[in-house]
């Protein structure tokens, strides 16, 4: 996935401005530095933490795949702590997670990040959001904004025109930032 992210950055003209790092968020600081990470060195930190708690899903046989799907003992707090460590002052954090984890995420971001925007992703019209994209600015005291979000699928399962525009047409999501 890291190679794909790097290829996408190059393809979209950001190859010289994007750094993709494949590391373990629980690694000791010396290993993180060796991987090229700089404390408070990034204007934007982005994460897609695993959504599933250990024991709630059948673990994949492949260790790397299992790690990508099951959050470790560090939980969401470890992910937020990691991202906060590497976000520059006034830098942005962006992550996607389950909608049911919103309260926990807001609590973890409190006093570290402000100007929080919550962008819900709805599987279909008239269904509750199942995923959220949360974005905040490190050190900001600005308040929370709940954005309109995006409906992903029509009743027949096909993508909505808005989702197609993002997924296939390169349209940006308006995260209000």
Residue spans for each PLM region:
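Short, structured loop/turn "capping" segments at alpha-beta junctions
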Residues: 16, 53-56, 89-93, 114-117, ...
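Mobile active-site "lid"/loop adjacent to the S-adenosyl-L-methionine
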Residues: 40, 49-78, 82, 86
């Amino acid at each position: 996935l890291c190679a794909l992210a790097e290829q996408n950055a190059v393809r979209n003209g950001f190859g010289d401005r994007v750094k993709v790092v494949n590391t373990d968020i629980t690694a000791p600081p010396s290993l993180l530095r060796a991987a090229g990470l700089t404390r408070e060195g990034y204007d934007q930190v982005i994460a897609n933490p695993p959504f599933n708690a250990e024991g709630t899903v059948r673990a994949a046989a492949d260790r790397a795949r299992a790690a990508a799907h099951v959050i470790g003992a560090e939980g969401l707090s470890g992910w937020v702590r990691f991202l906060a460590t590497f976000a520059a002052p006034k830098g942005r954090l962006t992550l996607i997670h389950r909608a049911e984890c919103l309260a926990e995420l807001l609590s973890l971001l409190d006093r570290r990040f402000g100007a929080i925007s919550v962008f819900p992703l709805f599987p279909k019209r008239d269904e509750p959001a199942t995923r959220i994209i949360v974005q905040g600015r490190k050190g900001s005291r600005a308040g929370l904004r709940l954005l309109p979000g995006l409906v992903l699928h029509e009743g027949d399962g096909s993508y909505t025109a808005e989702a197609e525009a993002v997924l296939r047409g390169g349209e940006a999501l308006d995260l209000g930032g």
